[in-house]
Amino acid sequence: MNMNDPIASLLGGWSIELNLYSVLLRVAVSVVFAAIIGCERASKRHAAGQRTFILVSLASTVAMMLDKSFAGTSMPLISAAAVIAIAIISSNSILYSSKNQIKGLTTSVALWTCGIIGLTIGAGLYTVSVIGYAALICCLALFPTFEIDLKNRSNHFEVHLELKNREDLQ
């Protein structure tokens, strides 16, 4: 089934099937990827840290492996429920500041993406997992400096106004 996956082909047939060694590999990869992503978020003092990312990824990986073990069912119900649960959990990291600015949106999306990567690891799609993980790390670690550089070179600027009452708008 996953023999088209280059990493699974390198590892061998045991990594595709659900056995003790493939379960250990999938859990280990899931924890390591999530720990690195969580470390990056925690180092910037964001709402969700390393443990949160590890737990979300681990739950997703286990949910997908459970779905794969119930091969007779037509729909992956446990992993679908995991996606919904992760969306609910990640939405709790979004806050509105006193200046009506949204805080935590990137962390929320990163948490959800980490859960999706956990699902791909649980499915045994190692190449997809590595590519998704690399893209997520690039977005979280490299793009902020690129974004700041673009803003500094831009001729546009932001103005924030606070008014005491509506009559001041006239």
List PLM regions with ranges.
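Alpha-helical transmembrane segments and their membrane-interface boundaries
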Residues: 1-78
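Hydrophobic alpha-helical transmembrane segments of small proteolipidic membrane proteins, enriched
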Residues: 12-14, 18, 22-23, 27, ...
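C-terminal ends of transmembrane helices
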Residues: 33-46, 89-102, 145
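Structural signal for membrane-spanning alpha-helices in multi-pass inner-membrane proteins
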Residues: 34, 38, 64-68, 92, ...
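Membrane-interface helix caps and helix-loop-helix hairpins in membrane proteins
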Residues: 43-46, 70-75, 97-101, 122-127
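Small-residue-rich segments of transmembrane alpha-helices in multi-pass membrane proteins
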Residues: 55-65, 86-89, 108-121, 166
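Ligand-binding beta-strand-loop-alpha-helix segment within the catalytic cores
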Residues: 77-89
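Canonical alpha-helical transmembrane segment with a positive-inside/aromatic-interface signature
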Residues: 100, 124-170
